[in-house]
C-alpha cells in the first residue's frame, strides 16, 4: 500500500487507475510503479507555494525606472557624471564617423538619435551599467540599402538617405518591441559562437573595404558598380594609383595612434583602471582639426575636411516620405529585420559579458523591449539603430559608472556637444574619421582571428569551414546574404540536434556479452558479426531499448529505423546497403525502458503501436518498464496494453523483468 506522501505526489493524475474498466488485471494487483515517489527515474515535484506579485511589483518589474530612480543615492552622482562624460567622448567621434563616411547624412541626425535612444533604454532595462549606441554592423547594412537605391536611380537625395536611416531604425525598434512582448528572447540561442565569429569576420572586412575610398583620398573617381564587397575591393585595387599621398599618410598616422592608444590602455588598465576614461579619440580629432586649420591642409594638400556642421533643433516625426510610403517601407523591411537581429545579438553579448562581472540576472525579453523603445525613439529623429556595445559598456564601467544615470548623463552631454562644440570639428579631415572606423574594423578582425587560431589549434575543421563559408558568402553577395546563410546553417544544426534520437539499445555482441549501444555513438558492433557464431547463439535473445526522452514524430521515426537495422544487422548504425543476416524471429524478448517518456504525441503513439504490433505478430514477448502514469493512461486508452498482454507485461523496474524471464539483464 502506498504511503500518504506518495498519494499526495500522484494527485489527480492517477485517478484513472481506480476507475479503469480493463479486466486484464485485478485492482489489487496494479503494480507500484504508478507511484511517482517510487519511480527512481522521475523527479519529485516540490510542493512550493507560489505568491502572486502585487500590481505595484509588476509595474516596477516592467518599468524599472519607477524602482531605481526614487531609491537613487546622490553619492553616486559624481561617478555617474564622470562615466557619462567618458562615454560621450567615445560616442561623439564614432557618430561623426558613421554619419560622414558610411551614410553621407548630416551628423545632427545621428547625434540626436544617439542621445535620445539611450534615455528611453534606461527606463526599461534592468542592466544598470550597459551603454548603447550605433554599431558598425548596422551602419553597414543601412549603407548597403542606400547604395542599392543609388543603383536603381540616378541619384539619391540626402533627404531620402535621412529617411531611410530613420525608417530602418523604426522597423528594427518595432520588431524588437514585438519580440519582447511576445517573449521571443529565447531566439538568442540561434546565435552560435561559430555564427558570431563568421559575422564578425565578415563585418570587419567589409568595414575596411567600404572606407577605402576615403582612407586613401581618391580624387576624380567614384565607385558606381554593384553593391558586392568583392567588386568594391577590386575597384580599390585598380585605382590605387589615384590615391592622395598626403591623405594616405595622415590616415596611416591616425590609425596607428588610435590602435596604439587602445593597446596601451588595455595593458595599463589593470594597474591604472582610470586610464580607460581618457578620451584619446577626441584628443586626436581635436589635434587634427587644429593642425588642419592652422596649415590649411584642404587647400595646400588636397585633404578633404568635414566642413560646416549645421546644428538645428529637430522635432520628432515619423521617417516616411510624402509619396510612395508603402514602396519605401518595402525596400527597407529586410534591412530593418537584419538590424533588429544584430541589435539584439550585440546587446545580449554585451549584457552577458558584463553580467559575469556584476552577477546580474539577464532577461532577454526585457532587453528586447528596452531596445525596441530606444530604437523607436531614435528613429523619430532619423537616427541610427542603436544597441549595446561591449567596448562602450566596458568604458562606462571602467570610468566608474554606478547606475543608469551614467547613460542619461552621456546622452545629455552628447546633446550639449551637438549644439555647442560641433563647429570645432568642421575642419577635421574626413580621412581621420574614416581611420576611426577602420580601426574598429581592425579590432574586430583581430578578435575574430584570435578565435579562429584557437579553433585551428584544437582542429575543429567543421566549425572553421562554417566561419570561412560565411565570410566568403558575405564577400561575394553582401552582408545580408551572409547573415542569412549563417542563420540557415545554425537553424539546420539546431534542428538536427533536437531531432537526433538519444535512444539506447542493448543486445548480444559477438563475444556473447551484452552491452548498451548509444544510437549516436560509434560502437564495437559496427563490424559485421558472423551469424553462425556459437557465442551469439548462446547469448540471450533479448533486446532492451531505453528511451530517455519524450516521444514525438521526429525521434519515433528514427526509433523505427534503428530497430529495423538492429534486427537485421546487429547494430542500429549499420549501413542499409549491407546484406541482412538476422531476422526479427531471432529475438525472444523486447523490453522498452520508458524511463524518460514523460509525454507522447499522436504520431509517435501510432508509430509505437505499429512497432509493438509487429513484435507481437512475430511472437516476440514485449515488456514495458518505468512508464509514466500519464503515458500509461494513454497506452491503456488506445489499446496498447491489451496488445502486448495487459498489465502482466508492464513492470516498474528491469529487475522485475529479470525475475519474470528467469534471466539476468544486468541493466
Swiss-Prot record:
It is found in: Endoplasmic reticulum membrane. It comes from the Eukaryota. It holds the Pfam family Sulfate_transp. Residues 1-27 are annotated as: Disordered. Residues 532-657 form the STAS domain. Belongs to the SLC26A/SulP transporter (TC 2.A.53) family. Possible sulfate transporter. This is Probable sulfate permease C320.05.
